[in-house]
């Protein structure tokens, strides 16, 4: 049953994540800075999630070590991944970029095998080969290949793979997943807020369409 739930949640996650480019692309076309998009996206998601958890009376307290680990996960993992993925949208079709991003399970499998000596079954090895072939086919176009876009999306794959692998082997694995997700979103939003303000790229946007897209 737990394995079935895991597969179901993974499928739902992939399906909803695949919708992100539909809304991010419109904001990019409207000339909104990447940093502003990420502040609104993760800020709104984090605040809504926090309200939901408080309504459920979840324990939101973190130890000092957990604060350090969560902030690193938010900035160094989730945050950097979002940065690379958003920039890839500027150089290649958003649907293709997001599809290539889902190559990250291969990165996770390889990291776990190399650094944690986990055994890769034959079917996993076959899946890795098929995934590599899929990335090649998605990246190939009849014209000029947008190498910079491919670089950005592959970097998003690597950083997110490292993020997932690190979660499996850190103190964060013992945290409630809902609380962990909430704080990762909030720390990511805070990181991009500081970055956007420092670079003069923070925009106060009240257009209903933009806010709806971010939600």
Each predicted region: which residue ranges?
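Membrane-interface helix caps and helix-loop-helix hairpins in membrane proteins
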Residues: 87-92, 139-148, 200-206
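Transmembrane alpha-helices of multi-pass small-molecule transport proteins
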Residues: 29-80, 107-108, 159-166, 181-200
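Hydrophobic transmembrane alpha-helices of multi-pass small-molecule transport proteins
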Residues: 49, 111, 120-140, 152, ...
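Specific transmembrane alpha-helical segments of multi-pass solute transporters/efflux pumps
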Residues: 16-21, 53-101, 137, 215
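Hydrophobic core positions of alpha-helical segments in small-molecule transporters
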Residues: 12, 40, 73, 100-103, ...
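Glycine-/small-residue-enriched transmembrane alpha-helix faces in small-molecule transporters
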Residues: 1-36, 40, 144-169, 190-194, ...
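Residue-level signature of transmembrane alpha-helical cores of multipass secondary-active transporters
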Residues: 7-10, 70-74, 86, 98, ...
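Specific alpha-helical transmembrane segments that line the substrate/conduction pathway
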Residues: 36-47, 85-119, 156
């Amino acid at each position: 049953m737990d394995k079935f739930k895991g597969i179901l949640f993974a499928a739902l996650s992939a399906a909803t994540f695949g919708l992100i480019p539909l809304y991010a692309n419109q904001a990019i076309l409207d000339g909104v800075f990447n940093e502003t998009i990420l502040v609104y996206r993760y800020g709104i998601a984090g605040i809504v999630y926090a309200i939901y958890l408080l309504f459920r009376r979840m324990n939101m307290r973190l130890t000092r070590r957990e604060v350090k680990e969560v902030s690193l996960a938010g900035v160094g993992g989730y945050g950097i991944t979002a940065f690379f993925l958003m920039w890839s949208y500027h150089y290649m079709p958003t649907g293709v970029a997001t599809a290539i991003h889902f190559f990250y399970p291969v990165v996770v499998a390889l990291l776990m095998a190399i650094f944690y000596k986990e055994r890769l079954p034959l079917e996993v090895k076959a899946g890795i080969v098929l995934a590599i072939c899929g990335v090649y086919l998605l990246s190939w176009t009849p014209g000029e290949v947008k190498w910079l876009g491919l670089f950005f999306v592959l970097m998003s794959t690597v950083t997110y793979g490292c993020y997932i692998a690190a979660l499996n082997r850190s103190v964060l694995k013992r945290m409630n997943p809902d609380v962990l997700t909430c704080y990762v979103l909030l720390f990511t939003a805070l990181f991009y807020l500081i970055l956007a303000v420092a670079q003069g790229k923070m925009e106060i946007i009240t257009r209903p369409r933009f806010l709806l897209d971010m939600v």
